[in-house]
Amino acid sequence: MSDSEDSDFSDNQSERSSEAEEVEENEEEEEQGSVAGSDKAEEEGEDLEDEEEYDEEEEEDDDRPRKKARHGGFILDEADVDDEYEDEDPWEDGAEDILEKEEAEVSNLDHVVLDEDHSGSRRLQNLWRDSREEALGEYYMRKYAKSSGGEHFYGGSEDLSDDITQQQLLPGVKDPNLWTVKCKIGEERATAISLMRKFVAYQCTDTPLQIKSVVAPEHVKGYIYVEAYKQTHVKAAIEGVGNLRMGFWNQQMVPIKEMTDVLKVVKEVTNLKPKSWVRLKRGLYKDDIAQVDYVEPSQNTISLKMIPRIDLDRIKARMSMKDWFAKRKKFKRPPQRLFDAEKIRSLGGEVSHDGDFMIFEANRYSRKGFLFKSFAMSAVITEGVKPTLSELEKFEDQPEGIDLEVVTETTGKEREHNLQAGDNVEVCEGELINLQGKILSVDGNKITIMPKHEDLKDPLEFPAHELRKYFRMGDHVKVIAGRYEGDTGLIVRVEENFVILFSDLTMHELKVLPRDLQLCSETASGVDAGGQHEWGELVQLDPQTVGVIVRLERETFQVLNMHGKVLTVRHQAVNRRKDNRFAVALDSEQNNIHVKDIVKVIDGPHSGREGEIRHIFRGFAFLHCKKLVENGGMFVCKARHLVLAGGSKPRDVTNFTVGGFAPMSPRISSPMHPGGGGQPQRGGGGGGGGGMGRGRGRRDNDLIGQTVRISQGPYKGYIGVVKDATESTARVELHSTCQTISVDRQRLTTVGGKERQGRSSTHLRTPMYGSQTPIYGTGSRTPMYGSQTPLHDGSRTPHYGSQTPLHDGSRTPGQSGAWDPNNPNTPSRPDDEYEFAYDDEPSPSPQGYGGTPNPQTPGYPEVPSPQVNPQYNPQTPGTPAMYNTDQYSPYAAPSPQGSYQPSPSPQSYHQVAPSPVGYQNTHSPASYHPTPSPMAYQASPSPSPVGYSPMTPGAPSPGGYNPHTPGSNIDQASNDWVTTDIMVRVKDTFLDGGVINQTGIIRSVTGGMCSVFLQDTEKVVSISSEHLEPVTPTKNNKVKVILGEDREATGVLLSIDGEDGIVRMELDEQLKILNLRFLGKLEV
């Protein structure tokens, strides 16, 4: 201090001492004379006596705390969260001693304060009188800055701060350190107990453990803390403990500043919001569900909305709660029921009103009967509360703000937020509501965002419930939860609580909550969650119906069926359809159409549209059009309503139709009759009929670059350019699909040039109606007789009956197979020229390529050689089985000439299996058998030793070839008409006479067997389709098309005109004229 300050301080001290002495003298002299002085002394004396009495009570009850007694008026009992146990306040432990020291000096302290007040007021008056501003400011600085409030009130505040500091000493460098030791997860507590037992066991030995403590916090998994001075002490303690084997070689010391955090217990304050759910811990409403109405954080209370439990028996007895419980020995909790004011009044209870609430026994009830009551925060369970669906139904139909989808989840976890770094969010609660920003990091429920505001440049931290996702129009997002989970799309509209997005896959508008969206750049894969199905996949709905998946949802599919209707089905209700990439159909111009072809719709509801074929099923095609919004651009139409882009009408196929029915399969025409009946030339074609024409592999430059049309096979009707060609095959680049394929040259026709002709046409004058096979395209469904066209002349009778042997053994091979080495043809040709040897395997074709059947020379000697063919029993002419392969068997009734057993000779027909036609039926669809001339075939072999003998004019055909009479019921030999749900009649040919002529309904078809429900006997029997015939429908009957291109379609028969009927189809409501034989009557 300076000299002036020292002098001022000494003057002040002298003034204070003199003033104190004067005050004491005045009090002693004027103790009875001054009323004011006596009153003041009495008040001071009473204060001192009260404090002394209070201290005496404290000394008597030192063994129990007096915290609540002293501070009961300032602390709320309800706000004490940890009411299960009470701790002494550390401040009180240190402060009681200090207060005891100060109580003896209270009187002196009061005198000092009075002296200071008197001296200060006197000096203040002098300063005001002299008007010295500097001195006045210095006075106030000294008065209010010289001591703190605590020092002025308690005095000796230095001792108090020292004692408090002693209670909060932090660990230093001289204290033991904490070491983290890796432990087996889940065994932390048990490991700490085992170390404690080990410490006790070694305590009285020569080598006690040097560790001080072991800590296993609940929130730390996989580690424990060991307190010791050195790391070697820790290793010695954990040696031999199995759970600590993994941490024996590596222990890490905890920094000194972080040691206190290991034992710090921070009680998480539950942030309850209105409309959230809690359960009661105890009391009458224990475990009852309740909804938060409002929260009072200052009073630590919470108001709940719940279903009351009112004991009506007690109200009826007019007893108080205390008397009622005293009377009833066993407590019985009343059931939950909503408050009914009328019922309470009827039992004698008093109900009053307070605004919108009803008051009964000091409790508030709403108009709907719910109880609103306040509870302490410690009386409720706030974590993991999930109301069940039954509780929600009792509580309310759908409480406000509750997401039933979330509530019904079986998991006990709280619904976690789905916020991620990079999401755009906005604040929905608190002071910064509507503030937008971008998430920088996510740490549990703490979200750090960078606000998008010009005045806010620093990151801000928010709890997750105060944020919600924010999207702008044009954002590309992905649905991460809810009904449309996994779908992606573009946001087209943003509402207050939901977002409208346009799906990338299905092109539908989806309405989704913002919390279920996430910004993304990729597009949905279109595969369901299980990976079993994908968008646009062909699935089987039932045995007769297929469809295409047009929308994938979490639990269901939306399927566009073949009839154009969209159905919603569950995942388990559909089966994946076998891949039909190679399916073929015919368009309106008889062009072949395949999957991935570009076609145009010329008829039906989608007329004028263009699209790409995705699937073909029977006569239906599923197409995809990028310009169509509905169903993701998928639509279905009939194949005959399409026209192939770039295609042209192929050769006429009218001679293959019956009654206007065009075969849907492209394999109905014979592959060996290009251009209408000519035989193919020698080369690679022929399907291996005679084993000839393998080709040398030389390039044919003349054909390269020419535009050709494919005339046969699965690509029939396609036009393309030849890129490469050899003697047998050509590589053709198709115009429509831009793909290059290999095609047999025999199946190509140059556009603009003449079609290839055979050697000679052997077609008859008129197409034989009776000999057309297969009937109604049955051949195209089984490969055995698929490509047979009129094999031989069946309309002539008698069948070569009057001919006699025209040629002897010396004839030239003009009418026989010229390249057959087994025939004694003269002159003979060398084998190497035609690559045909005697040791070749016999071909299934009965003759050489392009030749006619070659009879044996009558004079040819019999040579004992193994017979190639098995015994062949030709069909009796009266046998009804002609073309139906299911009915063929070696017939028991031989022809009048007897069974055909040719003499052993090297000549053979090379038939592997007998043909039901009886004459050289080949299995190869490419082989060609022209109609034989009358002189080339000896039709009536007999057991004569000289080979063949002429047939008598009246003898039947040995091959059993019995052509149908034109106009006969041609569909009776086929079972293609069989389908489900139609009414049939059992024919007389069935063995069981009890069901003959009964009518029934076909329930299912398996192969050639039908399960028929007989209406008369009400039983189900299995009958072969050959013993059934369809019931002819009558007017106004509901019918089903059983034959033709509209097969399986249904409709109503409006009228009958002769053998035709007018039908209104159900699918497109069109009127069609169909033959009655093409219709089956549906079940009534």
UniProtKB/Swiss-Prot annotation:
**From start to end residue, where is composition biased (Polar residues)?**
759-790, 866-888
Major location category of this protein: nucleus
Q: Using the chain's own numbering, where are the disulfide bonds?
A: none
- The UniProt annotation puts the region (Interaction with RNA polymerase II) at 312-419
* InterPro entries linked to this entry: KOW, KOW_Spt5_1, KOW_Spt5_2, KOW_Spt5_3, KOW_Spt5_4, KOW_Spt5_5, KOW_Spt5_6, NGN-domain
The biased composition feature labelled Pro residues covers: 855-864
Protein name (record):
Transcription elongation factor SPT5
| Stretches with biased composition (Acidic residues) | 20-32, 41-62, 77-91, 832-842
Q: Identify the stretch(es) annotated as Disordered.
A: 1-91, 667-700, 748-973
Q: Which organism is it from?
A: Danio rerio (Zebrafish)
Q: Where is the composition biased (Low complexity)?
A: 894-909
Which cellular component appears as one GO term in the record?
DSIF complex
Q: Which sequence positions carry the modification called Phosphothreonine?
A: T773, T782
Q: Domain KOW spans what residues? A: 272-305, 419-450, 471-502, 593-626, 702-735
For region 8 X 7 AA approximate tandem repeats of G-S-[QR]-T-P-X-[YQ], motif CTR1, the annotated ranges are 758-815
Q: Which UniProt keywords apply?
A: Activator, Nucleus, Phosphoprotein, Repeat, Repressor, Transcription, Transcription regulation
Q: Which residues carry this modification: Phosphoserine?
A: S665
The coiled-coil segments of this chain are none
Outcome of swapping V1012D: In fog(m806); reduced development of dopamine containing neurons in the hypothalamus. Specifically abrogates inhibition of transcriptional elongation
Spans of biased composition, class Gly residues?
Answer: 674-694
> What post-translational events are described?
Phosphorylated. Phosphorylation by P-TEFb (CDK9) at Thr residues of the C-terminal repeats alleviates transcriptional pausing and promotes transcription elongation.
**Compartments where located:** Nucleus
Give the family this protein belongs to, as stated in its UniProt record.
Belongs to the SPT5 family.
The annotated region (Interaction with SUPT4H1) lies at: 175-269
